[in-house]
Design a protein with these regions (language model features):
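Short, compact, well-ordered microdomains
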Residues: 54-88
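Long, non-catalytic architectural segments outside compact domain cores
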Residues: 1-55
Length: 88
């Protein structure tokens, strides 16, 4: 993955992708406002947004980092930097 992914929320505006969560879902965070995290399920007619707690979002990101490390993904460093910027 070389490009950042963004999605527009109808109320909170621009969100950026924090980590894939599996099964057609991704974790996104608000870009400009107070940090809020969403589990976004991509559907044929749009997206479903579910607000999730900070620790759940962090857990999804940690699981994804572990998977990248285990698989030797070339994108691990990029995801690690995003994790640091978002959660630390």
């Amino acid at each position: 993955m070389s490009a950042e992914r963004y999605i527009n929320h109808p109320t909170f505006g621009m969100l950026y992708q924090v980590a894939p969560a599996g099964k057609g879902r991704d974790v996104y965070a608000t870009l400009y406002a107070q940090k809020m995290f969403f589990l976004v399920t991509h559907q044929p007619r749009g997206a479903q947004f579910e607000v999730i707690p900070y620790l759940d979002a962090r857990h999804h990101a940690e699981v994804h980092l572990t998977r990248c490390r285990r698989e030797g993904s070339m994108d691990e460093q990029r995801w690690r930097e995003l994790f640091q910027q978002t959660f630390i």
